[in-house]
Amino acid sequence: MAKKSMIVRNARQPKYAVRHHNRCKLCGRPHAYIRKFGICRICFRELAYKGELPGVKKASW
């Protein structure tokens, strides 16, 4: 889990745009961030399996 202080700090708008860090909106994870959805890969996987992400379906070939 992300540190509570980092989640709160990231929620505020930074003074300079370069200081912005991509963090998951649900859990605050800084790595494996998917820009299109604004969440990390773990949260993405959970939501996709539940069917809560529109337009996402499991691949099969």
Swiss-Prot record:
Residues recorded as binding Zn(2+), renumbered to this chain, are: C24, C27, C40, C43
The UniProt function text for this chain reads: Binds 16S rRNA, required for the assembly of 30S particles and may also be responsible for determining the conformation of the 16S rRNA at the A site.
Output the InterPro entries linked to this UniProt entry. Answer: Ribosomal_uS14 (IPR001209), Ribosomal_uS14_bact (IPR023053), Ribosomal_uS14_CS (IPR018271), Ribosomal_uS14_sf (IPR043140)
Instruction: Give the family from UniProt.
Output: Belongs to the universal ribosomal protein uS14 family. Zinc-binding uS14 subfamily.
Its quaternary structure? Part of the 30S ribosomal subunit. Contacts proteins S3 and S10.
- What GO molecular function annotations does the UniProt record carry, in alphabetical order? rRNA binding; structural constituent of ribosome; zinc ion binding
Classification lineage: Bacteria, Bacillati, Bacillota, Clostridia, Eubacteriales
Q: How is the cofactor bound?
A: Binds 1 zinc ion per subunit.
Keywords linked to the UniProt accession: Metal-binding, Ribonucleoprotein, Ribosomal protein, RNA-binding, rRNA-binding, Zinc
Under the heading SUPFAM superfamilies, the entry gives: Glucocorticoid receptor-like (DNA-binding domain)
Read off the HAMAP family from this record.
Ribosomal_uS14_2_B
What GO cellular component is one of the record's annotations? cytoplasm
The gene for this chain is rpsZ
Q: Name the cofactor(s) required for activity, per the record.
A: Zn(2+)
One biological process term in Gene Ontology:
translation
Protein name in UniProt: Small ribosomal subunit protein uS14
Q: Which PANTHER family match?
A: 30S RIBOSOMAL PROTEIN S14, SMALL RIBOSOMAL SUBUNIT PROTEIN US14M
